Each structure stands twice: as C-alpha cells, then as structure tokens.
Amino acid sequence: MRTLLIRCTLALACLAALPALAGTPIDQTRPLDARGRIEIENLKGRVEVRAWDRQEVKVTGTLGDGVEKFSMDGDRRNLRIEVKYPSRSGRTEPTVLIVQVPILADLEIETVSADIDVHGIASRELSLESVSGDIAANGAPREARIEAVSGRRNSISRMIP
C-alpha cells in the first residue's frame, strides 16, 4: 500500500511538472512603416512569417524552455527580433516564432537549426539563411537571397522584374 502511495505521488508530481516544461508564450506588437525593415534571428525551432496589410509587426509563438531572452527592438523603420540562447550549450528547447509583417517590408532571417517559412512578402529585399533548417518561401520580392547549407529550399514562386 505504501509503495502504491509513493508511486501515485511521483506520478502526480511528474504531471504537475509538465506545464513547467512548456515554453513561454510570446505576444508582442510594434509599429513598422509599410516599407520598413525587419531582421529576425532564431537559433533553433521555427520562424513563420506571413504578410498582412497593417503597418505593424506582430510576433506570437512559444519561447523555448531554457532560452535566455527574447527581444524586439527598433523603431518604425528598422525592427530587430532576436531569440538569445545561453552562451554555454545547455539544454534549451526550440523556439517557434509566428511573425506577421507589412507586405512590402524588407525581411532578413538568420537561423542555425530552425526552419523558415515565409509567405506573401512583396518586399524589395528578402534574405533567408539557415545552416541546417529547411526554407520555404512564397512571394514576390524584387530581390531574393535564399541560402541553406544542409536544409532543403523551396524557393520564391513569383518574382517581380
């Protein structure tokens, strides 16, 4: 009977710890000019970008457990979104960023092992880089630079001359 009580207590403790393992929710919005510039850095996880017709950037998603800091800094012309991981390589969970940006905003995304998915951007410049994450892009930028060292690339579907 005592063994059963100990097992039940341990099981309940494990279940109670599950929410602590989940990441921290992200929900931030900043103004950005229609033709502003956004830079996004995320080491691991996923970065999804969708264009919309508002002059603001909205970031939602989940900050991975163990991440040091999430920052969204800048002004109406330039905005930088960065996920900072601890300098020591400890156990950190992936971060998922879902970013809505003005359709004409220039966009630069750099990741290491995070997938990148961009849809609907019609900017002057689009730059997407990932070391080992996959990249999918669909839009109409004037210039596009897409680099994946060991990840797959599904490139721009329509280019403006």
Q: Model-found features: residue ranges?
A:
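Positively charged n-region of N-terminal signal peptides that target proteins for export
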Residues: M1-R7
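Acidic (Asp/Glu) and glycine-rich low-complexity loops/linkers
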Residues: L21-S130, A136-A148, N154-P161
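Bacterial N-terminal signal peptides
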Residues: R7-P19
